[in-house]
Amino acid sequence: MSLVYMNIIMAFTTSLVGLLMYRSHLMSSLLCLEGMMLSLFIMATLIILNAHFTLASMMPIILLVFAACEAALGLSLLVMVSNTYGTDYVQSLNLLQC
């Protein structure tokens, strides 16, 4: 396995561990999710470029669209929770009665 792939897998794993460990604040959870999506995007792009998959060339773009939608929803939820309760704790999400 190439050193580039190992670094990307390590970045994904580090973001996943960060998401599992620092889940008390919503902002840190969102940053870890963005790190995971970025490493998935880079990995998908490298695999498609190295394997010359012409039919799957749209997959990284679709992944970026989903990452942008996830970021927009997460930031809007962060703004709503911080304006309503004054904190960005994930425990405040249980009070929203969604």
From Swiss-Prot:
GO terms for molecular function: NADH dehydrogenase (ubiquinone) activity. InterPro entries: NADH_UbQ_OxRdtase_chain4L/K, NUOK/Mnh_C1-like. It catalyses: a ubiquinone + NADH + 5 H(+)(in) = a ubiquinol + NAD(+) + 4 H(+)(out). It is a multi-pass membrane protein. Keywords: Electron transport, Membrane, Mitochondrion, Mitochondrion inner membrane, NAD, Respiratory chain, Translocase, Transmembrane, Transmembrane helix, Transport, Ubiquinone. The chain crosses the membrane at residues 1-21, 29-49, 61-81. Its EC number is 7.1.1.2. Pfam families: Oxidored_q2. One of its GO terms (biological process) is ATP synthesis coupled electron transport. GO terms for cellular component: mitochondrial inner membrane; respiratory chain complex I. It is found in: Mitochondrion inner membrane. Core subunit of the mitochondrial membrane respiratory chain NADH dehydrogenase (Complex I) which catalyzes electron transfer from NADH through the respiratory chain, using ubiquinone as an electron acceptor. Part of the enzyme membrane arm which is embedded in the lipid bilayer and involved in proton translocation. Belongs to the complex I subunit 4L family. Core subunit of respiratory chain NADH dehydrogenase (Complex I) which is composed of 45 different subunits. This is NADH-ubiquinone oxidoreductase chain 4L. It comes from Hippopotamus amphibius. The lineage of its organism: Eukaryota, Metazoa, Chordata, Craniata, Vertebrata. The gene is MT-ND4L.
